[in-house]
């Protein structure tokens, strides 16, 4: 009878035997409606304690019994429900003894939750405080081959962990249950697909009904393939694609690790740069060059100890890391590598030689991190290359001066081009008759910081950096303008300018030269060009094209520094050259070594046979001049006649010279 009475009271007050209830976070008023979709039409004021009990409900459907005051009568009800969002709790109410209604509401709510857990795309395991399995969803079954009803109540530690892992996990589990904080963990789990890596996002929840128990909900995502993809990307990011060796990034990490764990032992870095690799690459193509890099890497590896690491930071450079080493050991290694790389490499039917230059640096004396020690090994390598290639150098602090000088030149030579700090000096050439018909233009740098800088101090850097191209173009055009000024004063002379190998590819110079000749009303080209023998060797086809284009403009072509480089009679016959310049080393030794006199006579004889003019440079004494004139030299230049001088100074010198003549 009590059940009927309570149910009738509930119906009379709320209009339903099983009304829908709702409680918000901001109010302790319990709102009722006949169904979930209708607006609340009845309310009951709860005590703070009653409201707090309802707010303890979680997202998992649960029930609690509560005594409510309805129409001044006490009514015991079952509230079945859950937390439906961040700020609301809702469910159904039934009279305390209406067991079928309570069971129906619980079944409805729990069946929904069960379906969500079962069909989720995560492996969901619910554990109690002892680590026993309470839920084991379908994805867990698929991965493990175990059924939920077989594992319920069993220890997760025994089923899926080794003894050592289980002991550690039990300790951690007790700590986590005490703190109640959510956490994430990555675990390797044995599955039907082998060992798989799962990321578990773990959260603690209260049972919400009956005995207040705490459960751990573990939601796991299989991240095995994601981690493998990340590892592949990591390997790609740290591996040279051509040789398979570690790249610069990887090597820097390895060097830093070696230095940090050196324990007072020395760590060495050896920097290798292949000589003439670019020429091989240009001649035979990139596929050939790539194969050569692979073969070279194998050759270098054959010279290393088992614990030494080879890397390719890029281009034609290699790095070797040696831990627990010494300077003598690194020098011995460098010698082995140099000896091996002097042997030819055969790729297909082609045999090539590629030596290398080697720099050595050690930690701690040359640097305490990878950046410093690599930089110093690089500096030592460039010192070895400048010293003649095919050798090694150990870094010394004095070598840094080269780096500082390079940086100073890199900054200030660019400013010099922009701010008109370059000037041209002219040195006259005297014919065997004593006439001045031509000059040589020699560039100088009037630095505000260092004063007048000779070309030997900056031309090599200009060639290395590529600044020689705009610098050379400026020289040619400025010389033409100066010759035009002299022409207007009645001084008609030709001027020779030097062209380097880097300038040969600058086809814009011909257009610019044509344009300035037209602007200044020249009917002829007053410019002669001086090419070194190395220009002809490095790219003979391009050199031939350049010579022909200058010749078409009316310029004469002189072969500079003849006899000091790669001279051959075939070059003199092939290239349309107008004159050869006898290098000053022959002139200087004329009266010191009899063989020099014979060489000069032979060179003059060959030139005359080919109808070429011969110009001697570096003439400093009357005795030298007499020998050269007697043996058929057409023009001479040197300090005996005049030093290089600015254009204004040359005009004064020229007027005095004409008066003496």
UniProtKB/Swiss-Prot annotation:
InterPro entries: Biofilm_reg_signaling, EAL_dom, EAL_sf, GGDEF_dom, Nucleotide_cyclase, PAS, PAS-like_dom_sf, Rev_trsase/Diguanyl_cyclase
Alphabetical keyword list: c-di-GMP, Hydrolase
Domain PAS: start-end pairs: 109-179
Pfam families: EAL, GGDEF, PAS_9
CDD domains listed in its UniProt record: EAL (cd01948), GGDEF (cd01949), PAS (cd00130)
Reaction(s) the record says it catalyses: 3',3'-c-di-GMP + H2O = 5'-phosphoguanylyl(3'->5')guanosine + H(+)
The enzyme's E.C. designation: 3.1.4.52
UniProt record, GO biological process: post-transcriptional regulation of gene expression
Keyword Hydrolase carried by entry: yes
Listed NCBIfam families: GGDEF, PRK10060.1, sensory_box
Database matches in PANTHER family: CYCLIC DI-GMP PHOSPHODIESTERASE PDER, DIGUANYLATE CYCLASE DGCP
Stated name of the protein: Cyclic di-GMP phosphodiesterase PdeR
Originating species: Escherichia coli (strain K12)
Chain's gene name: pdeR
């Amino acid at each position: 009878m009590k059940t009927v009475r309570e149910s009738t009271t509930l119906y009379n007050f709320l209009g339903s035997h099983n009304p829908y209830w709702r409680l918000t976070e901001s109010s302790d008023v319990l709102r009722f409606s006949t169904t979930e979709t209708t607006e609340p039409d009845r309310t009951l004021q709860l005590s703070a304690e009653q409201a707090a009990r309802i707010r303890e409900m979680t997202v998992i459907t649960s029930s609690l019994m509560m005594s409510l005051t309805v129409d001044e009568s006490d009514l015991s009800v079952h509230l079945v429900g859950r937390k439906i969002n961040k700020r609301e709790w809702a469910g159904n109410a039934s009279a305390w003894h209406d067991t079928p209604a309570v069971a129906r509401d619980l079944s409805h709510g729990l069946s929904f939750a069960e379906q969500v857990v079962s069909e989720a795309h995560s492996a969901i395991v619910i554990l109690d405080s002892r680590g026993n399995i309470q839920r084991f969803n379908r994805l867990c079954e698929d991965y493990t081959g175990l059924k939920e009803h077989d594992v319920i109540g069993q220890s997760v530690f025994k089923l899926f962990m080794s003894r050592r892992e289980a002991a550690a996990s039990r300790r951690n589990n007790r700590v986590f249950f005490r703190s109640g904080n959510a956490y994430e963990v990555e675990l390797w789990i044995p599955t039907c697909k082998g060992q798989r890596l799962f990321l578990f996002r773990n959260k603690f929840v209260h049972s919400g009904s009956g005995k207040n128990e705490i459960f751990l909900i573990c939601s796991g995502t299989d991240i095995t393939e994601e981690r493998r993809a990340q590892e592949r990307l990591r390997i790609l990011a740290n591996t040279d694609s051509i040789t398979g060796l570690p790249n610069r990034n990887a090597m820097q990490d390895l060097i830093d690790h070696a230095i940090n764990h050196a324990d007072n032992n020395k760590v060495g870095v050896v920097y290798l740069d292949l000589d003439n690799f670019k020429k091989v690459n240009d001649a035979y193509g990139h596929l050939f060059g790539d194969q050569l890099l692979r073969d070279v890497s194998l050759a270098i590896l054959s010279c290393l100890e088992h614990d030494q690491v080879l890397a390719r930071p890029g281009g034609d450079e290699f790095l070797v890391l040696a831990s627990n080493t010494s300077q003598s050991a690194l020098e011995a290694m460098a010698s082995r590598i140099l000896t091996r790389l002097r042997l030819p490499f055969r790729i297909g039917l082609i045999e090539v030689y590629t030596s290398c230059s080697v720099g050595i640096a050690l930690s701690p004396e040359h640097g305490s991190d990878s950046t410093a020690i690599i930089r110093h090994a690089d500096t030592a390598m460039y010192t070895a290359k400048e010293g003649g290639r095919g050798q090694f150098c150990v870094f010394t602090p004095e070598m840094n001066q080269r780096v500082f000088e390079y940086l100073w030149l890199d900054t200030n030579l660019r400013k010099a081009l922009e701010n008109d700090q370059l000037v041209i000096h002219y040195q006259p050439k005297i014919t065997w008759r004593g006439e001045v018909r031509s000059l040589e233009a020699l560039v100088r740098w009037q630095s505000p910081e260092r004063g007048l800088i000779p070309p030997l101090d900056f031309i090599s850097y200009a060639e290395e950096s590529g600044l020689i191209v705009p610098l050379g173009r400026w020289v040619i055009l400025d010389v033409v303008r100066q010759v035009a000024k002299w022409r207007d004063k009645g001084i008609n002379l030709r001027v020779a300018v030097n062209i380097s190998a880097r300038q040969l590819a600058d086809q814009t110079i011909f257009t610019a030269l044509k344009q300035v000749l037209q602007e200044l009303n020249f009917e002829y080209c007053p410019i002669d060009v001086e090419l070194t023998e190395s220009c002809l060797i490095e790219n003979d086809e391009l050199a031939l094209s350049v010579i022909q284009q200058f010749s078409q403009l009316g310029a004469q072509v002189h072969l500079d520094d003849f006899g000091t480089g790669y001279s051959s009679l075939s070059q003199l016959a092939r290239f349309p050259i107008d004159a050869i310049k006898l290098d000053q080393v022959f002139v200087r030794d004329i009266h010191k070594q009899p063989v020099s006199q014979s060489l000069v006579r032979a060179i003059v004889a060959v030139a005359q046979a080919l109808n070429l003019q011969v110009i001697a440079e570096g003439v400093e004494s009357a005795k030298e001049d007499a020998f050269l004139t007697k043996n058929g030299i057409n023009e001479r230049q040197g300090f005996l006649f005049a030093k290089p001088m600015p254009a204004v100074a040359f005009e004064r010198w020229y007027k005095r010279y004409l008066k003496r003549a």
